[in-house]
C-alpha cells in the first residue's frame, strides 16, 4: 500500500490494480496509465451548477431506469481488446456527474 504520492514515479504507467493500493489525500485520475492530480474542492458556483444539472438529469433519466452518480465515483474505461481485469484497466476517472443505464456496468467499486 502506498500512502504518499511522492513515492510514485509519475513517468511510469499504472493500472487500476495499482490505483487500488494507493491511500493518499490527493485525489487523482488515471488516463492511459498516467497519473493526473485532480483539483482540490470545486468552487461554490461549480457545486451549484453540478447540483442543478444533477436534478435535471435525474428527472430526465428516472423513467428510463438509469442511475445518476456524482463524484467521487470511479468510472473505469476499458480497452475492448483487453480484459476487464484490474491489471488491464489503465483509465479511471471521476466525472462530476455520471449516468449509467446498463446495470451490468455498475459494481461495488463504481462503473466499468
Where does each model-flagged region fall?
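Gly/Pro/Ser/Thr-rich low-complexity, intrinsically disordered segments predominantly at protein N-termini
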Residues: 1-112
Amino acid at each position: 500500500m502506498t500512502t504518499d504520492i511522492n513515492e510514485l514515479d509519475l513517468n511510469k504507467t499504472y493500472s487500476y490494480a495499482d490505483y487500488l493500493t494507493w491511500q493518499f489525500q490527493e485525489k487523482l485520475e488515471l488516463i492511459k496509465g498516467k497519473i493526473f492530480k485532480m483539483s482540490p474542492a470545486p468552487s461554490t458556483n461549480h457545486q451549484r451548477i453540478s447540483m442543478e444539472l444533477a436534478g435535471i438529469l435525474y428527472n430526465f433519466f428516472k423513467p428510463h431506469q438509469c442511475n445518476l452518480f456524482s463524484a467521487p465515483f470511479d468510472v473505469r474505461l476499458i480497452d475492448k481488446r483487453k480484459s476487464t481485469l484490474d491489471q488491464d484497466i489503465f483509465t479511471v476517472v471521476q466525472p462530476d456527474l455520471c449516468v449509467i443505464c446498463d446495470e451490468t456496468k455498475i459494481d461495488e467499486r463504481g462503473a466499468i
